[in-house]
């Protein structure tokens, strides 16, 4: 399974923040090949996960990855558009690592367009859909490019945690990890660097130690 370091960091951070309990439910919007769902399932033994993916090839790959894992009974992969997804379930947690690119970078491949770009689901629509699917006491976890910081602050209310991510300690921020809900809360801001002097930082290693064998 092809993975990105920032996605792994996001999955590990979200897994550490989620408070699971018997029959707690999580929705993974745009699961791709299932990475985040598998990471959450590994760290939260009581949670049940619905992983939704619009692109058929990715959904099939996610289902295969889940079936070959020990978490097959905990993760349900759904090949559907989140905009037409109907569920009687209100989720305790929602997690999303949405597409990062704008229309200026559209691919000629329609499937890749859908999976990798924002033409299908903008941030405001994503937030509104999530509010309808999340319990009043629930939390939403989101990974976004840092260049969209102003849009994030404008569109999202009640952010409780915000982690700004640098690829290297001497580089600018390039990602931002957010936790928010419908509850009023005080914002806790922090930052993390993935690497320093060419090596993974201790903060990164601590978060990823249960997922990276080398740590």
Residue ranges and their predicted role:
Residues 1-16:
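Conserved SAM-binding loop and adjacent beta-strand
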Residues 3, 120-173, 178:
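Conserved Class I SAM-dependent methyltransferase catalytic core
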Residues 7, 11, 33, 37, ...:
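A general structural signal for well-ordered alpha-helical segments in protein cores
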Residues 10, 97, 126, 180:
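Residue-level signal for inorganic ion chemistry
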Residues 12-89, 93-96, 102-107:
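Conserved SAM/SAH cofactor-binding pocket of Class I
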Residues 98-125:
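Mobile active-site "lid"/loop adjacent to the S-adenosyl-L-methionine
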Residues 172-215:
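SAM/dcSAM-binding transferase cores
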